[in-house]
Amino acid sequence: MRHRVSGRHFGRTANQRKALLRGLLASLIKYERIETTVAKAKAVKELADRLVTFGKKGDLHSRRIALSYLPDRELVKKLFNEIAPRFSDRNGGYVRVIKTGFRIKDSAPKAILEFVDYAKPEKESDKEEKKAN
């Protein structure tokens, strides 16, 4: 029976699970858009929303909490100085999960995890076309 068993375990030990989520969080903050499975995306979404809220507070205690989740101080700086200020007028829902189908090898449901205000970087060819016009 699975009574009172909640949360996502991903078939891993607690340390492995923590390392997985820290890595995904770091990638999300570094690239602002990642592709992963739906279950992992939903788990990281909760943590990312919480971290952006800490980033909006901006005090020392919030920075230290963010350091416990992120492996690199540069990522904490990016979170507090670049990402959190973009969401100053929003009260939650900073990250979205977009389902993209299934992986070919094992049919795992895939998703794109990105910040809500993510803008695709323009390609060089697009920039040249705009200059020509």
Curated annotation (Swiss-Prot):
Gene3D superfamilies: Ribosomal protein L17 (3.90.1030.10). PROSITE patterns: RIBOSOMAL_L17. Keywords: Ribonucleoprotein, Ribosomal protein. InterPro entries: Ribosomal_bL17 (IPR000456), Ribosomal_bL17_CS (IPR047859), Ribosomal_bL17_sf (IPR036373). GO terms for cellular component: cytosolic large ribosomal subunit. It holds the Pfam family Ribosomal_L17. GO terms for molecular function: structural constituent of ribosome. GO terms for biological process: translation. HAMAP family: Ribosomal_bL17. PANTHER family: LARGE RIBOSOMAL SUBUNIT PROTEIN BL17M, RIBOSOMAL PROTEIN L17. Part of the 50S ribosomal subunit. Contacts protein L32. Belongs to the bacterial ribosomal protein bL17 family. NCBIfam families: L17. This is Large ribosomal subunit protein bL17.
